């Protein structure tokens, strides 16, 4: 696609306004609800994150940037880790410097020192694209550059993306950004080039504590499927109706 055609398409598309809904924490799913979301394909790739195991080391973020050619020192990333620190005054402090790439080695959050004695709870939350069953980003893309595979992975065709930004605005999880080099929409792809060859995603492979897992929800013998069906799992921002396929163990009500 030439630059002139891209500019023409960008300027000709008007009137789209992203819906604004109030933030909420999460929804706990029953096994029957999870099974209802798997679709018709023989494969349904899903992520499982265990907050109780995440230590905020940032290895996953580093691995993702390296694997997927996201500039290392630019403040955008396909996956990130947030730190939540709750204090005695019931304040929840949240930060993710450089997406948590370098881990969390200071008690400062946004330049403010947090008194260790005031902390009542602290934890880390891995985030990224939720590869929703009903992705809002796919619905709003005016040229079909954002699409969903039969096995549930949401991808972006760089050769078709016109950089209008509608998908970035539509994503309720903040999982999309403009690639600083290619000038197109960018996001997690579940390392599709790896999983289609039987390999793990870069972030899962890099996680030293098993906080990130990846599996096929259609395979009853998959360890990830077994965990999702037998443990208390939740999803983020259920109120948007996108049916996220990223599941969490140990979600706190403060996570949004």
Where in the sequence are the language-model features?
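N-terminal secretory signal peptides and thylakoid transit peptides that target proteins
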Residues: 1-19
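C-terminal segment of N-terminal export signals and the immediately downstream linker at the start
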Residues: 2, 23-63, 239-241, 247-248, ...
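Residue-level detector of secondary-structure transition/capping positions
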Residues: 16-17, 23, 211
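Non-heme iron-sulfur electron-transfer modules
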Residues: 28-39, 67-117, 147-162, 175-196, ...
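Exposed loop/turn and edge beta-strand positions of beta-sandwich/beta-sheet ligand-binding modules
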Residues: 43, 123, 150
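Cysteine-centered iron-sulfur cluster-binding motifs in ferredoxin-type domains/subunits
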Residues: 47-63, 67, 121-144, 155-174, ...
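Short flanking/linker segments adjacent to small metal-binding domains or redox-active Cys/His motifs
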Residues: 108-110, 123-130, 138, 247-256
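Long, compositionally biased charged/polar accessory segments in the mid-to-C-terminal portions
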Residues: 202-256
């Amino acid at each position: 696609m030439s630059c002139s055609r891209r500019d023409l398409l960008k300027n000709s598309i008007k009137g789209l306004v992203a819906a604004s809904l109030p933030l909420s924490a999460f929804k706990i799913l029953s096994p029957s609800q999870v099974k209802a979301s798997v679709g018709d394909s023989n494969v349904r790739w899903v992520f499982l994150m265990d907050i109780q195991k995440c230590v905020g080391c940032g290895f996953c973020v580093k691995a993702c940037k390296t694997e997927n050619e996201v500039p290392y020192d630019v403040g955008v990333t396909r996956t990130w880790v947030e730190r939540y620190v709750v204090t005695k005054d019931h304040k929840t402090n949240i930060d993710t410097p450089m997406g948590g790439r370098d881990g969390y080695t200071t008690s400062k959050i946004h330049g403010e020192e947090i008194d260790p004695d005031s902390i009542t709870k602290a934890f880390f939350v891995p985030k990224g694209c939720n590869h929703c069953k009903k992705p809002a980003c796919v619905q709003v893309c005016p040229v079909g550059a954002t699409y969903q595979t039969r096995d549930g992975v949401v991808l972006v065709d760089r050769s078709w993306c016109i950089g209008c930004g509608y998908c970035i605005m539509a994503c309720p999880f903040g999982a999309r950004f403009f690639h600083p080099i290619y000038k197109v929409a960018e996001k997690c792809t579940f390392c599709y080039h790896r999983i289609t060859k039987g390999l793990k995603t870069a972030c899962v492979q890099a996680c030293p504590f098993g906080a990130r897992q990846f599996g096929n929800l259609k395979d009853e013998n998959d360890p990830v499927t077994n965990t999702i069906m037998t443990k208390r799992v939740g999803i983020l921002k259920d109120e948007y109706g996108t049916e996220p396929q990223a599941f969490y163990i140990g979600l706190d009500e403060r996570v949004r």
